[in-house]
Amino acid sequence: IRDRGCTMLVSEDTDLTAKDLSGGIGEIALLDICEEPEALAARLRDVQQYVMEHSPHRIPALFHCEALGGPVVPHTVLYPNSIGLGATFDTALVRDMTNTIRTQMRAMGILHALSPVLDVAKDLRWGRVNETYGGDPTLSAAMSCAFVQGLQGDDLSTGVAATAKHFLGYSQTVGGLNLTRTQADARELREVFAKPFEAAIRKAGIRTVMNSYSEWEGRPVCASRKLLTNLLRSELSFDGLVVSDYRSVQRLLDDILATADDITDAALQCLTAGLDMELPDRLGYADGMTHAFAEGKVDISYLDRAVLRVLTLKFELGLFDEPYPQWQQYHAAAFAPTAAAEQRATRESIVLTKNEGNTLPLTDRSIKLAVIGPGASSLRLLYGGYTQPSMLEMFQVVQDSSAMAGVGDKSTAKPVRKYDLAATDREIHKSRPEAKTIFEALQELYPNCTYTQGCDYLDPTQTDFAAALAAAESADAVILCLSGKNGWGRHCDTGEGNLSLIHI
């Protein structure tokens, strides 16, 4: 049972005896990572040694983190969000990107990436569109295959296991809301939303799949045999590991659907449907499940099947041969300068919708330039969710805020404070000192350049339109940087939160 469970590790976790590691653990979720890569590798070596010493069979843990445009670790590679990469139509660029991510994660000892996002974004109200490659299933399929091929490599024993998420129909929910019902019939589900997953399975050999938070035909996806076994395995021929999106099992108790009597019942529903491993902690796949098997409430073959899939993936990754981070082997190549490649990807991701009168480029560097808008002066607003800069604020419980689904509870919370965007920018600058705001970059090119905020990115009452108009009228050209903020909580205007429908 323990090898099919997981526990979370955050920066403050220095006492391993206080963690759920006694008897071993299947995976460890790395969240709120503050260490630089070499220090993190050293820390994970110590954690792995502790896990193996406390495992009856010395089974190593598998570490995982998000890696959509780079590992969520300071001083690692950081590419544009997937929606920008989709705009490049450049599969070779994506493959090169994930090849770099692969070597960096290998060096640090993180062999499981909870990426890519293969949801097809048809409803632009859905807050996680930026994590996808857009609304074309064929483009998403091509990009996802490139992502997986670069990340897993030609031989998985030197690669990182990719995760196709979120299976299935997560982006096509009622009203574009998170954690709600998928609005797609069986045909559309297969022909549109399953297409990128099938490509990643058949053409790229992806090794793990993560369930969607949504429900389909009255069943939560994590407990749907129709989706996780009949469709995913029998029709699409997936033979790898299925992991839960964070605390999906618990949702069988918490939400309006409420299909389970207790957490053990919820876990058994998920296990028999085809969910092999529970992330990010052991709530259902725990002692209650052990007792259920001992009492003969469910066939032991379901447990054997899941354990085999977990151990198979660990063997494929070479974890039993080399369980520790391979810093010496990989770090030189992994952390060679990548700025040129990242800048190329960023340039290719930018879409010019029109250029009337050949206004661009602004070749005269002496012009008076007015830069207006909240997006020009903040580093944080440049980054989407599931990037290292946005993860810096994930566990900061903000007044009147909702957190990322699956992690916003008291066990991971930091002290409550009012959200401070400038403070987040300062933290980003510490981990990425080379980063510049749009205004800072423009100042280097146009000496006669001024900045006016004009409005807030979120609060409609915080405006100074008069100052913005005055700046525009006195300038030769205006660069207007309107922006939202993508991430978790009510201090963001797009992204993922734990609110779905209003609960009474």
Describe the residue ranges of each PLM region:
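Glycoside hydrolase catalytic-domain context in secreted enzymes
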Residues: I1-I502
